Amino acid sequence: MQKVCITTVKTGPLLLGMALLFAAAGCQPAAPDAAAIAKAQAADEATIRQLDADWVKAGAAKNIDGWDAFYADDAVVLPPNQPIANDKAAIRRSVAGLLTLPGLSLSWQPTKVEVSKSGDLGYLHGTYQMSMDDGKGQPVHDTGKILEIWKKQPDGKWKCIVDTWNSDLPVPTSTAK
């Protein structure tokens, strides 16, 4: 005759352990879903587009203080045919040089605005149109492209941290002999 051995397990501690495990799992923060991330990105992209439109208005008004207000404290500006402007004073000199050109008319439009999934960085690229007077009072026209990198600041506001632009036109050649 064969002996059958039945072992009993106390279920109280096992059930308590499982309950604690499930309770701890339920306390984990839920990962943001794709729809929430996309909604936040779209809102931030709209904010950057509006800030950029306001920046264009400051440029059209030749408002140096208004223009400078869009830059973060640690911004860098990479203007064409000039050294890098990597502090507030250098940026202001560069902007003042641009906005005080005789006969200046300047505007730009974003082609694309994108914000990172983390929501702290964004970029914008687009095109610009500019007219000014040459040294003889004749109009000079230029078109080109722009690139701006924006960063959300600790206070939640967006500021430009990198700004650059350059012409689509070929470099003029000298006709002097």
Where on the chain are the PLM-derived regions?
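A short, structured loop/turn motif at beta-sheet edges
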Residues: 115-122, 151-157
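Bacterial N-terminal signal peptides
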Residues: 12-24
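Short beta-strand edge/turn micro-motifs at domain boundaries
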Residues: 28-33, 143-171
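N-terminal secretory signal peptides that target proteins for export/translocation
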Residues: 1-9
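A solvent-exposed, acidic/Ser-Thr-rich amphipathic alpha-helical stretch
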Residues: 42-47, 64-118, 127, 132, ...
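Short, low-complexity N-terminal intrinsically disordered segments enriched in polar/charged residues
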Residues: 27-69, 73, 172-177
